[in-house]
């Protein structure tokens, strides 16, 4: 019987959530891509074909693939879920009471398939057939968005992350991604796969304003044996780490959290862009950023109510070794000379998805790093990524494990 549990980064991967890039990418243009957190526009059809190859590779490894669009359609079939999502996303404060009422009614009358496509892919004023007496639509240009597209939903890793016996519904840092979390909140509450199941919601499943307590799943590595490794990047804050750690400790789901202070720039927007877990004792690391002297803290529970001890750790590798009971980690650095390594890290060479110990999925374009992995005994299942890689995310970024074995 399948279960909702992720016990490691490297145990057998059994079930995963992906999101095929479609309508949202068609709304991505040179003039809006930076606001939507992309560096460039992607060839939509080619990106979809590359994503299909990624999903196919997972299925060939006996991994069950769930697709976000399908789950959202099936969730919207629950009337309470549909009403909640529209009330949450089409609020009076966001649109004004008159236009919000008119827009909600228009969306309520859509079939579930069409509504899911709009919620994920966006809607421009030029595509809106209804008239409203509100001022707001009269003041907008035709190509302005009524509902902003969510192209970053491609990166299902970030919006929610499963940690041992529960899930964190992450308060996202960037406004362009904050609506994503509500889709996962609805799915985990009402979709038949999750409704009534026994799992913990650690953090983020309420209607609070989280201020500076941001967490994104690309910074969260479930390294196993009760330990969690979290990067404090440009997207995850110390406040977010401590809130998540407190919830994990209170639930009895983690024995320690190792927090690493990362440089705050785009090339390492998340920990998993510079470091991933490939085998029980093996990590991929981009050494230009992941220096041994990065400020690191070890958080452990103090009592049973979520309080914690916080102590400095002077070497994150030693902290990981201690947590996993290993004498020494095996570190594989990004391949090629300094120029090639920088290029390949930028193209997600370190952002691989482990499907079982010593077997990972990564982009075929990163030839120097893939060769280095192979020589170190790591099998790389390569997938095309010339278009997907331009979104600044690799196989780990594009996947949210929902079921994975312990180590």
Curated annotation (Swiss-Prot):
Chief localization class?
cytoplasm
Keywords, sorted A to Z: Arginine metabolism, Cytoplasm, Hydrolase
Q: Which reaction does it catalyse?
A: L-arginine + H2O = L-citrulline + NH4(+)
Kindly indicate whether the keyword Hydrolase belongs to this entry.
yes
List locations, semicolon-separated. Cytoplasm
Q: In which pathway does it act?
A: Amino-acid degradation; L-arginine degradation via ADI pathway; carbamoyl phosphate from L-arginine: step 1/2
Q: Does the keyword Cytoplasm apply?
A: yes
Gene Ontology biological process terms in this record = arginine catabolic process to ornithine; arginine deiminase pathway
Q: List its EC numbers.
A: 3.5.3.6
- Cite a single GO MF annotation: arginine deiminase activity
Active-site residues (renumbered): 397
An example of a Gene Ontology cellular component annotation for this protein is: cytoplasm
The family annotation for this protein states: Belongs to the arginine deiminase family.
State the HAMAP family in the record.
Arg_deiminase
Against NCBIfam families, the record matches this protein to: arcA, PRK01388.1
Protein name, UniProt field: Arginine deiminase
Query: Which species is this UniProt entry from?
Result: Vibrio parahaemolyticus serotype O3:K6 (strain RIMD 2210633)
């Amino acid at each position: 019987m399948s279960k909702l549990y992720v016990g490691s980064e490297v145990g057998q991967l059994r079930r995963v959530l992906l999101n095929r890039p479609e309508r949202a990418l068609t709304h991505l243009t040179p003039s809006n891509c930076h606001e939507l957190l992309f560096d460039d526009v992607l060839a939509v059809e080619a990106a979809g074909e590359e994503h299909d190859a990624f999903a196919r590779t997972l299925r060939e490894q006996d991994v069950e693939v769930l697709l976000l669009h399908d789950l959202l359609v099936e969730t919207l079939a629950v009337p309470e879920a549909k009403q909640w999502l529209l009330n949450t996303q089409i609020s009076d404060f966001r649109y004004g009471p008159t236009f919000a009422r008119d827009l909600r009614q228009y969306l309520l009358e859509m079939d579930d398939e069409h509504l899911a496509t709009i919620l994920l892919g966006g809607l421009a004023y030029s595509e809106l057939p209804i008239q409203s007496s509100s001022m707001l639509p009269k003041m907008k240009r035709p190509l302005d968005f009524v509902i902003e597209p969510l192209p970053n939903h491609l990166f299902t890793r970030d919006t929610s992350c499963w940690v041992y016996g529960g899930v964190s519904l992450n308060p996202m840092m960037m406004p362009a991604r904050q609506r994503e979390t509500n889709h996962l909140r609805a799915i985990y509450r009402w979709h038949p796969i999750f409704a009534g199941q026994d799992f913990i919601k650690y953090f983020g499943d309420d209607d609070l304003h989280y201020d500076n307590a941001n967490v994104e799943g690309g910074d969260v590595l479930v390294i196993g044996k009760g330990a969690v490794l979290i990067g404090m990047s440009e997207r995850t804050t110390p406040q977010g780490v401590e809130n998540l750690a407190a919830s994990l400790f209170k639930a009895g789901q983690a024995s320690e959290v190792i927090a690493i202070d990362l440089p705050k720039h785009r090339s390492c927007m998340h920990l998993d862009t510079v470091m991933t877990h490939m085998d029980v004792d093996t990590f991929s690391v981009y050494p230009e950023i992941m220096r041994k002297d990065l400020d690191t803290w070890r958080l452990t529970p103090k009592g049973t109510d979520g309080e914690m001890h916080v102590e400095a750790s002077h070497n994150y590798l030693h902290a990981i070794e201690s947590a996993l009971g290993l004498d020494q980690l095996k570190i594989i650095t990004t391949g090629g000379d300094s120029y090639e390594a920088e290029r390949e890290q930028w193209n997600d060479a370190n952002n691989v998805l482990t499907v079982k110990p010593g077997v990972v999925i990564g982009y075929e374009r990163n030839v120097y790093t893939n060769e280095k992995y192979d020589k170190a005994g790591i099998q790389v299942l390569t997938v095309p990524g010339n278009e997907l890689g331009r979104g600044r995310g690799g196989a780990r970024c594009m996947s949210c494990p929902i079921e994975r074995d312990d180590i």
